[in-house]
Amino acid sequence: LIAFVYCSVLYAQHIKLFSQEKIVILGNKYVAQNIILDAMNIDAEESIFSYNLGELQDNVESIEFVKSVKVSRILPSTLMIQILERAPIILVLLDDEKYFFDIDQTPLLANKEAINFFPVPIMTFTNDDPIKLGDFQLTTALRFVIKSKAIHNELYENLSEVRYKNNNLSLITDERTKIDLGDDEAIYKISILKEFQHTINDKRSLNDYSYIDLKIDNQIIV
């Protein structure tokens, strides 16, 4: 039996039965296929069994905007690459660079192509000291975006800018409504804003107002 299996393998190699003839890449929307193929660095003449699937996976996962990868073989001669891309939720403008961040707070360098591809709100800081990657204020601001999106996704989907000015937080909607949240209890105020929106829903929307002020406790000024 062992001899039969060995001979079968030799014969398959001889006729190049398992030579890689096709690569199927699924799930990529932003990351170009040629970038993925370059990262894999494979030889089309090799058998699909000559590759370490774990190494191929690691190589593709090293590409920015790729979150996870599954590599599998389909006999006799196909490699399948299933891609899960990162989904940016905010574009942060820092002094020296622009970064996207996803729900895991992973920084992703934002070039012009990426900015045009991902239509997400921007976050700006106007502070005495410049904000840098890893700063506590940036981490806090990202947590606010993630939590507020979970609480009031309708507002997030209509958001153009998240604006910090010396710790005072303002939101600007796509229709240019300015929502002032002040410098504390921002998440609680998002919940209040959601309730307010439900209250007025039959008659008007938040975009009907040019200005909404929640800086004063237990008050909404429009």
Segments from the language model and where they lie:
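Hydrophobic membrane-insertion alpha-helices, especially the h-region
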Residues: L1-L10
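Terminal hydrophobic membrane-targeting helix
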Residues: V9-A114
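Extracytoplasmic
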Residues: F18-Q20, V31, E64, I74-T78, ...
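Flexible glycine-/small-residue-rich
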Residues: G27-K29, I83-A87, T124-N127, T173-E175, ...
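Solvent-exposed, non-transmembrane alpha-helical starts
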Residues: S47-F49, I90-L93, P130-F136, L181-D183, ...
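Extracytoplasmic segments of membrane-associated envelope/inner-membrane machinery
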Residues: L79-E161
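Soluble extracytoplasmic domains of inner/organellar membrane proteins
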Residues: D135-T199
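Extracytoplasmic/luminal low-complexity segments enriched in Pro/Gly and acidic/polar residues
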Residues: D183-V222
